[in-house]
Structure formats: C-alpha cells, structure tokens
A protein has these predicted regions:
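N-terminal beta-alpha lobe that positions the nucleotide/phosphoryl donor
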Residues: 1-153, 160-162, 242, 255, ...
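Conserved metal-phosphate-binding beta-hairpin within the catalytic cores
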Residues: 105, 256-284
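Short beta-strand elements
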Residues: 108, 156, 165-184, 278-283
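Hydrophobic "anchor" residues
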Residues: 175-176, 206, 273, 403
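Conserved catalytic alpha/beta cores of large enzymes that bind or transform nucleotide phosphates
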Residues: 180-261
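A short, polar/charged loop-to-alpha-helix boundary motif
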Residues: 187-190, 282-293
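Acidic, glycine-rich flexible loop/linker segments
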Residues: 280-285, 313-334, 339-408
Length: 408
C-alpha cells in the first residue's frame, strides 16, 4: 500500500518522491519516510467519482470523500513506527518537479503534522489540491497533462535552525546559488522573507549578500508559529563560508545523482544538513550581478531596486494586490505589485505583464513560476506597494532588478 521512500520512483509515486528515492539510494541525507503511490490516488478517485466528474467539479469531488480504510490503516502503521514524532506531508504529483515545469508551490504540503487523523487529512488535502484553480491554471498555461495523478510523501519532520533553497550549477565551472534564512523553509520558498543570498564559485569563493530577516517560522507542537527575529540576528549571516561551501558541495553531488542542475530545498538542524526535495531547474536565473538597466529613466522618474527574479522588461499600470479580494481589479497587462505572492495567486500570472514584490528571493516559488511563464519579476523591493501606488505607470526590468515609476 505505502512504498518506503528508498523504493520510490517517479513512475509509481510522482516526481518529488521519485527524486527523494534516488537520493536515498545514492546515500544522501534525506529524512526517512514513505510514499503514497499514484495508483492509490487513482483508485480512491475512481471509487469516489468518475474522472470526468473530478475534472468538472474539481476539489469538491474529493474533499468530502473519506480516505479508503486500507489507506488509513497503512498510514496509521507508518506513523506508529515514528513513535508519535511529527511528520511533513508533501505533494508528489505525476506532473510535478519535472524537466518541463516544476509546478512550484501549487500543490499542498503540510508541516508539523502529528497523529493519524491529521496525516490522513493532510493526504486528502494533497489530493484535493491537484484540482484547485491555481494548479488548473498552471497546467493550462504550460499545456501540461490535463489528467494528472497525485502521489504523497510522508516524512519525518525536520525542525530546522536554518533552511532555504539552492540552485546547483548547470556546468562544472558554474556557480551555486543559495537563498537562506532562519527557521523553517516556507519562509524562503513562499517569499515571506528577504533571505540572505550566497553565490559559491566552483573554486570555493563565496559572495554573500545579507538581508534583513525580520521573521522566522518554527514548529510549536503541531502548529507553525511566526516569530520575530531578535534584532542582533536580523542582519547576521545565517551561513558562514564553511556552511555555504558544504551546501554547494552537497548540491553538486545531488546534481550528479539526479542528472543536471537541480532546485534543492534543504535544512540544517543541530549541524546536520538535510535534503528535503530536489527537482530540475526549469528556467535560467538572471545573472547574480545584474546588468545596467535596459531602459534609461526619464528625468524625475522614481527608480526602485530589488532582486532580479525573472528576465525581461514590461511597462504597464501598477496594480496593488494585498489579498485575494483585490484580484477583481487586475487587468491584462497590469504590473502586479504586492507584499509577496501566494501559490494561490498563480492565475494572475497568466494575465499580468510583470511582478513586483516587497519580500522574497530569486529562488522562491513565485520567481520560479514567473521565469517559467516568461514574466519579468523584481523581488524584495522595500515598500513597493506604497511607493508605486495603484494605477501609476511603471516599467519592470527583471534582468537589472529595477522598477521605474514614470513622472506624473
């Protein structure tokens, strides 16, 4: 019924589980766990409704149906072997973490899950997310499989002191790019903080850009809590040069094991580095050292700077979006300006001409999706929602990391 992660493959258990299985078989540090195979989802959906009904009714076709008793029993046995320790329940769709599209952040993953009832509910949430609006919109934009299946990964939870994302090099002499912050990884991958950014050269050189990390995410029992980072730690590097090189070295091994440049989520807990997931890099990053802006601003124009997240330029009316209630105001060609983006906002990326956020790094989920869709993005622009203003004419240069507000 369940497959140990050491035996998981992408064909039977989805992209995320398959990659973790490959890494475990290569002897790399991956938290132990199990996969709920794709066929379990297919069987559960087939028993609950027809495939056409599932596509037509979306999440509602699955959300209220009980998880089959044999699946629940297998999950209960697996959780019992951990002695009550918390787990993380991650999506592992058949179209996820692939070479032609990552579907980054679109499907549900739940941290700090404790007890069989919560695990079962989290597995169902993964299944439901396969048919949620953001995932459907992404598949349409990328012309992906219209009828994918959902595997699920259940792993031991890692209480990270430091975590982040790493892009391994595409060639032997290329650099490794690392974003890192305090606490659990969602702060970085969801763009909720401005992370430290590290570039580790093939020769071991380390270039570090330290950000102000105001908050961190931690586990408290079976809940996640956001805490304020103490003032002395906000501008302190979360990785020293030795840690950055250690991650880069591990990243090169991951790339060799999986074949090609990888987008790796990692964590450090009590000095131990863990690989939480890995997937192919699906679109090139802008250069670590941005070029000069491609458009010279007019006299008197306001120029803001941030991290270049996705190449290209776009000009259009700024549209400030602070929550889903603002979606109705967005028009095709607008420049989305927001505190940060949520995976649930992916449908907007099919409409807007560019993206500007106040927080987030170039390795966050929003930046990955913007690069895949070819939308210019500049991230981590302080007070962008206040300084740009709704309906002002702005130009986004996602290669140079600049946002220019026109005069007037």
């Amino acid at each position: 019924m369940l497959v140990p992660l050491t035996d998981a493959s992408a064909r039977t258990c989805g992209g995320k589980a398959g990659a973790l299985g490959d890494l475990l078989r290569a002897g790399l540090p991956v938290p132990d766990g199990w996969a709920v195979p794709l066929d379990v989802y297919r069987s559960a959906v087939r028993d609950a409704s027809s495939a056409s009904e599932t596509r037509r009714n979306g999440p509602a076709a699955i959300a209220d149906r009980p998880v089959p008793a044999d699946v629940r029993a297998a999950l209960a046995d697996a959780v019992a072997t951990l002695g009550g320790a918390p787990v993380v329940v991650r999506s592992s769709a058949s179209d996820e973490d692939a070479h032609d599209g990552a579907a980054a952040g679109l499907y549900t993953s739940t941290l700090a899950v404790r007890g069989v009832d919560a695990v079962v509910a989290s597995v169902r949430a993964c299944w439901v997310s396969l048919h949620a609006d953001p995932a459907v919109a992404y598949r349409a934009a990328r012309r992906r499989d219209a009828d994918p299946a959902m595997g699920v990964v259940v792993q031991r939870h890692v209480d990270a002191d430091v975590s982040g994302v790493m892009f391994t090099p595409a060639r032997p002499d290329g650099p490794t790019r690392i974003d890192a912050s305090w606490g659990l990884g969602p702060s970085v991958v969801e763009g909720a903080v401005n992370p430290d950014a590290y570039t580790v050269g093939a020769d071991g050189s380390v270039d570090a850009v330290t950000a102000e990390k105001r908050t961190r995410l931690d586990r408290r029992g079976d809940r996640l809590v956001t805490r304020v980072v103490p003032a002395p730690d906000r501008h302190r590097r979360v990785l020293d040069d030795t840690d950055a090189r250690r991650l880069a070295d591990l990243g090169r091994v991951v790339g060799a094991a999986l074949g090609g440049a990888q987008d790796v989520e990692w964590a450090i807990a009590d000095g131990q580095v863990w690989i939480l997931q890995a997937r192919p890099v699906t679109a090139d990053l802008p250069p670590a050292t941005p070029p000069s802006p491609t458009v010279r601003p007019a006299a008197g124009a306001t120029v803001l700077t941030g991290a270049p997240g996705s190449r290209g330029t776009a000009t259009g009316p700024a549209r400030v979006v602070r929550d889903p209630g603002d979606f109705v105001h967005v028009r095709r060609g607008d420049v989305l300006v927001c505190p940060w983006t949520d995976p649930g906002w992916t449908p907007l990326l099919r409409v807007v001409g560019g993206v500007v956020t106040e927080t987030g790094g170039v390795l966050s989920h929003a930046a990955i999706v913007a690069r895949e869709l070819g939308i210019p993005a500049v991230l981590g622009v302080p007070d962008a929602t206040l300084l740009l203003g709704d309906a002002s004419l702005v130009t986004v240069d996602g290669s140079a990391g600049t946002v220019t507000r026109a005069v007037g």
